[in-house]
Amino acid sequence: MSDQSFLDWPFFNREHRELATRLDQWAGDHLSALTANEHDDLDGTCKTIVKALGGAGFTAYAVPASAGGHHAKLDVRSLCLIRETLARHNALSDFAFAMQGLGSGPISLFGSEAQQADYLNAVAMGDKIAAFALSEPDAGSDVAGMTCRARRDGDDWVL
């Protein structure tokens, strides 16, 4: 276990300290085995990590309580502790967790009730991997420069 004296800072409460300790222990016990093949099967390893994080209850921090999360609203301190702890143990694990929040955030904030019901609980459980579009040719990571658009065609969407 690393030095966790920072958890004594006044903006962390008992729940944050318990979360950091529990995740650090879990990561030490599980991540080496989960990520042993990450260079051979990157996609498969990410799926395995997300499923395991979900099974341990950690991806539920990426969605609100209404979708199976731990808090009524997302708790940024918990999210930061999770990301820092995962990154210290394995960078790919941090990336896989971060995508759960980045992809589900827009659905939490702007998704229809049907979209929220379909995706967010599955994200909380680690059963679905959230994603979002950030890049395309000639736009790089400039979201405003993207030219891809979606238009409704009957019951479908066409990109």
Regions found by a protein language model. Give the residues of each.
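Intrinsic disorder at enzyme termini
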Residues: 1-18
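Short loop/turn motifs at secondary-structure junctions and domain boundaries
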Residues: 2-3, 42, 139-142
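Short alpha-helical functional segments enriched in proximate histidine and acidic residues
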Residues: 26-33, 106, 130
